[in-house]
């Protein structure tokens, strides 16, 4: 994505007004998982569908103990007016998450969410369709970046979130196209002796030049 914020880095100590009051971003991210997502601007139709879908998926995020935090370079007043459009698109899913206002672009730059190719009417760069997953330690665990022409897939966001949360509890990784409930890969750094203690349910070994051990975890 460019810039200096990378996986494993601490969330910057930044703050801004939002649709739900003033928010200190690092404090907001403490003691749980957080998704920070940006959009190019208020009212564009793709952005409306995205934020509506996020609102509709909120019960799934709540099940996983995840807080949501939106962001664009528009004002709080713009956000509040736009929420009416969003809730018209998904009438059964109210917008229950805050949206940060960042007209001076300070937070967008600090979180590495700027799109240098997209400009507003005054020639200022806009936020990209970026999405960051922040762990309970307030460090960046995953980033997704989409161009303005492509809306995000929130089933994929849930999938990678499930993977991250499992990997935070167990010495495992998830294979290609993995879905929740499917077998996972025991880390190669775990010896068979140690694996017997960590995974008493056992595992299945896939015969490859370097053995692949698959098991199930919750």
Swiss-Prot record:
Thiol-specific peroxidase that catalyzes the reduction of hydrogen peroxide and organic hydroperoxides to water and alcohols, respectively. Seems to contribute to the inhibition of germination during stress. Associated with the rehydration events involved in the recovery of the desiccation-tolerant moss. One of its GO terms (molecular function) is thioredoxin-dependent peroxiredoxin activity. It is found in: Nucleus; Cytoplasm. It comes from Syntrichia ruralis. InterPro entries: AhpC/TSA (IPR000866), Peroxiredoxin_AhpC-typ (IPR024706), Peroxiredoxin_C (IPR019479), PRX_1cys (IPR045020), Thioredoxin-like_sf (IPR036249), Thioredoxin_domain (IPR013766). Its main location: nucleus. Keywords: Antioxidant, Cytoplasm, Nucleus, Oxidoreductase, Peroxidase, Redox-active center. This is Probable 1-Cys peroxiredoxin. Residues 5-166 form the Thioredoxin domain. Gene3D superfamilies: Antioxidant, Horf6, Chain A, domain2, Glutaredoxin. Belongs to the peroxiredoxin family. Prx6 subfamily. GO terms for cellular component: cytosol; mitochondrion; nucleus. One of its GO terms (biological process) is cell redox homeostasis. Pfam families: 1-cysPrx_C, AhpC-TSA. The active site is at residue 47. Its EC number is 1.11.1.24. It is an enzyme of class 1 (oxidoreductase).
């Amino acid at each position: 994505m460019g810039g200096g914020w990378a996986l494993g880095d601490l969330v910057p100590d930044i703050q801004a007004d939002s649709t739900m009051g003033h928010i200190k971003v690092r404090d907001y991210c403490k003691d749980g998982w957080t998704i920070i997502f940006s959009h190019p601007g208020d009212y564009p139709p793709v952005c409306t569908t995205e934020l509506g879908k996020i609102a509709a998926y909120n019960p799934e995020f709540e099940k996983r103990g995840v807080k949501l935090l939106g962001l664009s370079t528009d004002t709080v007043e713009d956000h509040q007016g736009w929420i009416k459009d969003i809730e018209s698109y998904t009438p059964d899913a109210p917008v229950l998450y805050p949206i940060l206002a960042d007209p001076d672009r300070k937070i967008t730059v600090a979180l590495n969410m700027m799109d240098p190719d997209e400009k507003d009417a005054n020639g200022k760069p806009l936020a990209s369709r970026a999405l960051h997953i922040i762990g309970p330690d307030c460090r960046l665990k995953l980033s997704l970046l989409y161009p303005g022409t492509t809306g995000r897939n929130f089933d994929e966001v849930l999938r990678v979130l499930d993977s991250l949360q499992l990997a935070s509890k167990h010495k495992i990784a998830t294979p290609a196209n993995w879905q929740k409930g499917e077998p996972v890969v025991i880390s190669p750094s775990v010896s068979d002796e140690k694996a017997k203690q960590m995974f008493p349910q056992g595992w299945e070994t896939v015969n490859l030049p370097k053995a692949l051990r698959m098991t199930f975890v919750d």
